[in-house]
Each structure stands twice: as C-alpha cells, then as structure tokens.
C-alpha cells in the first residue's frame, strides 16, 4: 500500500510542486482524503499524520529554505513523517510538557530527553517534528517557559520505540510511545526559532482538524 501511494504521489499531496509534491490546495487535498477513507480509514490516518501535521506542514509554514530543500523532496517521495507533541501524564495540555532539549556545550546542537505518546506514524517514520522545553528566558524580570520545535531523524542514537498503542477502530495505524535518551539534534534542525514551538504546534494542528471532518463526512456517507 505504501509503495502504491508513493507511485500516486499521495505522500506529497500537500507538498509544493517545486519540491516534487503535487501541490494540492486544502480543498483538493480533503477531496482526496475523502476518497481514500471510503476504502480504508487507517490509510487516511497514515497519509494525514504524514502531511497534515507531520514534518511537511510546519516546514511549509515556518521552515528555512535549507530545511525545505533538505526534507520536503524526500518526504514527497515516501519518507514517512510524524508529529510528536503529547506526553504521558500531560494529555491535552501540551504547555506542561516535560520533554527537554538542552543546548550542547559546544553550541552545535541540542540533547533531547523525555517521552512522547500517541505519535501516529511513529512506527515507520523516518523524520518527525518534536516539541520540547528549551532553557527559559527572562522577560520583563520574570522567567518565561520556552517550548521549541525540532526536526528529528528517527535513526538517531537514543531514540526508542517503546511500544505500539492499540486502538479499537483504526487498527492499522502505527501509533507509538517514543522515548528519547540524550538524542543529539543539530542546531540547524530548530524550526522557526526558540520559544515558538507551542505556537507552531497549535497552528499545525489546525490543518489536522480540517482534515478529520474532511474524512469523517465521506466515511459516514459511505456507511449509510
């Protein structure tokens, strides 16, 4: 199935044509999602988590030209991506996340430590966008918590798929718990800027929220 989607260019529906994608508008993308969902809901979850909230979406909006050039063409060709925000014990309040990214002493990057739960596509993802606490900043005399977003290669040492999460309906999705232990992230993989990760995540999720009803309505119609 994944190879078939790749032949159709489905992994790059939302990726601009200049990077090898199909460059679909939101309307046409949701039409395609509505078609696929009448056949397989789990397949829609793979496609949607990859490009509605996975690495392509935040890179399109906030990535540097270098980040876009490095990753978007690869993602359009079938390298699967995912979005890592939620944590055990945090749930729907991502501002309370405990995963941390600490600057390295040599200034070349960050060391990531923590856990992320409900990471859809994490089972097969090559690249993810992950949010983590970075050192706080003092604003108007008060310490302000910082959350930043990073691009992470899943084959980096220290990344562990702890277990696959099970679901009652979408039994074919690859949703997992990921653990990070001193995972090195190069400094150039910071997306948008320090302290902007939570805002990036919430903006990115708006696209996913649009895609869900785009799939649910056709699925309901098909069942009727």
Question: What are these model-derived regions, one by one?
Answer:
Residues 1:
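Extended, charge-enriched "interface" segments that sit outside catalytic cores
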Residues 7-78, 120-127, 212, 219-222:
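Internal helix-loop-helix
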Residues 24-26, 93-95, 121-126, 140-145, ...:
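Short glycine/proline-enriched turns and hinge-like loops at secondary-structure junctions
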Residues 71, 86, 96-97, 115-117, ...:
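Short beta-alpha junctions and helix-cap segments that line functional grooves
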Residues 77-85:
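A short, Trp-centered hydrophobic/proline-enriched beta-strand micro-motif
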Residues 99-103:
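A structural signal for short hydrophobic beta-strand segments in well-ordered beta-sheet cores
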Residues 109, 113-160:
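A short core secondary-structure module
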Residues 160-224:
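Glycine-rich beta->alpha junctions and the first turn(s) of the following alpha-helix
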